[in-house]
């Protein structure tokens, strides 16, 4: 199916921000993709919410601190110009206050992004989840809108364009037993590559996450061990997508966006997932590698 891609005019200049009320779950998105040709646009971030990474402090190791433990400076909701109220700061951590309502809820919930696009980088943070908790860390994310059957703009979910580092209570969440070869457990490339070794700590304890992206090579680390590696924009990457829920047959739009992950410039946002459960993140820092 052919898709039409075009840049969206700056939302700030137009005084328009795409509403998250149009965000769809995977099933409805797939149904629309199979029925209609879809025009897709990369929703340009609001200029008022952009963050110049040069304004942020750099530590002795060369990392940019993108969360200062006190404020949401540089952060906003995915597809929004503010931080949704279910994301709070607690004891020096970013916390999502879950409601058990499932992923990317409208209104006061939704995913959180840092409003600066990174290209080649190393990302480090710590995370913990509540019992049975589920979340994720996204990278190279775009803000993508499509047209529904009536021609209205709808905001697509963040995971339609971004690889996901899974954040999960492996012992108590059913997703840990789904997928293939444990590829939905913590630190896995969600639904594609399992984390090996699987060394996650249980719910309520802090885990260390590390993601390196450099010229297409991606490495996931968990608790000071590298657990997987893959290569974007290669046949291997396309084959991984085709074997996943994001295949060309199952979800054409996701396949097209992820196969060209990061868009034309191979860069994108870092994000944290609202999956309806309590989750905490802290000590978030990024080293630019180019």
UniProtKB/Swiss-Prot annotation:
A lipid is attached at residue 20 (S-diacylglycerol cysteine). The keyword Cytoplasm does not apply. Keywords: Carbohydrate metabolism, Cell membrane, Glycosidase, Hydrolase, Lipoprotein, Membrane, Palmitate, Signal. GO terms for cellular component: plasma membrane. The keyword Amino-acid biosynthesis does not apply. GO terms for molecular function: hydrolase activity, acting on glycosyl bonds. Gene3D superfamilies: Exo-inulinase, domain 1. It is found in: Cell membrane. This is 3-keto-disaccharide hydrolase. It comes from Bacteroides thetaiotaomicron (strain ATCC 29148 / DSM 2079 / JCM 5827 / CCUG 10774 / NCTC 10582 / VPI-5482 / E50). The lineage of its organism: Bacteria, Pseudomonadati, Bacteroidota, Bacteroidia, Bacteroidales.
